[in-house]
Amino acid sequence: MGRAVKVLQLFKTLHRTRQQVFKNDARALEAARIKINEEFKNNKSETSSKKIEELMKIGSDVELLLRTSVIQGIHTDHNTLKLVPRKDLLVENVPYCDAPTQKQ
């Protein structure tokens, strides 16, 4: 697969992730859209293979971080936030254990 195709694929993946993570939050959706587009536009003329690979790694890491670590919070009161976790965030939830076992 060509490098341009991989870059475009990452661009689309970041936008899809943005839409899932910031669903129903117009301000965050717009800010993320602008930032993604800005970063890709700023590096559009990059020709160094090493630099492009580095930038793609950063983009992939950002996508993973957004997908696995960001949770929405909605202000419900003056000092209260309602957290809205996505289902994919709760998949690897490990229950609390008072007596952890030793690793062997």
UniProtKB/Swiss-Prot annotation:
<comment type="similarity">
    <text>Belongs to the complex I LYR family.</text>
</comment>
<comment type="subunit">
    <text>Interacts with UQCRFS1.</text>
</comment>
<dbReference type="InterPro" id="IPR008011">
    <property type="entry name" value="Complex1_LYR_dom"/>
</dbReference>
<keyword id="KW-1274">Primary mitochondrial disease</keyword>
<dbReference type="Pfam" id="PF05347">
    <property type="entry name" value="Complex1_LYR"/>
</dbReference>
<dbReference type="GO" id="GO:0034551">
    <property type="term" value="P:mitochondrial respiratory chain complex III assembly"/>
</dbReference>
<dbReference type="InterPro" id="IPR045298">
    <property type="entry name" value="Complex1_LYR_LYRM7"/>
</dbReference>
<comment type="function">
    <text>Assembly factor required for Rieske Fe-S protein UQCRFS1 incorporation into the cytochrome b-c1 (CIII) complex. Functions as a chaperone, binding to this subunit within the mitochondrial matrix and stabilizing it prior to its translocation and insertion into the late CIII dimeric intermediate within the mitochondrial inner membrane.</text>
</comment>
<keyword id="KW-0143">Chaperone</keyword>
<dbReference type="GO" id="GO:0031966">
    <property type="term" value="C:mitochondrial membrane"/>
</dbReference>
<dbReference type="GO" id="GO:0005759">
    <property type="term" value="C:mitochondrial matrix"/>
</dbReference>
<keyword id="KW-0597">Phosphoprotein</keyword>
<dbReference type="GO" id="GO:0005739">
    <property type="term" value="C:mitochondrion"/>
</dbReference>
<dbReference type="GO" id="GO:0045333">
    <property type="term" value="P:cellular respiration"/>
</dbReference>
<keyword id="KW-0225">Disease variant</keyword>
<dbReference type="InterPro" id="IPR050435">
    <property type="entry name" value="MZM1/LYRM7"/>
</dbReference>
<protein>
    <recommendedName>
        <fullName>Complex III assembly factor LYRM7</fullName>
    </recommendedName>
</protein>
<feature type="modified residue" description="Phosphoserine">
    <location>
        <position position="60"/>
    </location>
</feature>
<dbReference type="GO" id="GO:0044183">
    <property type="term" value="F:protein folding chaperone"/>
</dbReference>
<keyword id="KW-0496">Mitochondrion</keyword>
